[in-house]
Design a protein with these regions (language model features):
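Phosphate-binding/catalytic loops
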Residues: 84, 90-152
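Conserved active-site segments centered on acidic
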Residues: 1-81, 146-152
Length: 152
């Protein structure tokens, strides 16, 4: 089982969007018994809160199924429990590298790196642009799934 943890600042916008987009792609590829997906936050600001209404609205518009979600923070154990620790922007990466300073297994990356794009996925909490965030996440998740398919 390959395990993926998507990570953003609050775990209410980008990382849960990536979690449910990836789950949808995995389901459509009939790989749900081979790939496990979760999401988490670098901060404690939104712990226990549900997804942002903009994220919920965008997932519904795109017919991406989702379940009840409550924000959680990354833990030290996540490094051992997941194969991929995927951030959305440089700030996420900074806090991930602080939490797991010895990434000897090279698990830490940014989502758009899988699509050979070396830029951040903008936080719609600040931009209000959930469409752009969704497009970037969809692009990154599709590329990540293709990479994972090579391993299984």
């Amino acid at each position: 089982m390959i395990k993926i943890l998507f990570i953003c600042h609050g775990n209410i916008c980008r990382s849960p969007m990536a979690e449910f987009v990836m789950k949808d792609l995995v389901q459509k590829a009939n790989l749900q018994d081979k790939i496990y997906i979760e999401s988490a936050a670098t901060s404690t600001e939104e712990l226990g809160n549900g997804m942002h209404r903009g994220t919920v609205t965008k997932l519904r518009q795109e017919n991406i199924p989702f379940t009840n979600h409550r924000a959680r923070q990354i833990t030290a154990q996540d490094y051992n429990n997941f194969d991929y620790l995927i951030g959305m922007d440089q700030e996420n990466l900074y806090y991930m590298e602080k939490r797991w300073p010895n990434d000897t297994d090279h698990k830490i990356s940014l989502l758009l790196e899988f699509a050979n794009l070396f830029r951040d996925i903008a936080d719609p909490w600040y931009t209000g642009n959930f469409d752009k965030t969704y497009a970037d996440i969809q692009l990154g998740c599709q590329a990540l799934l293709e990479k994972i398919k090579e391993r299984i």
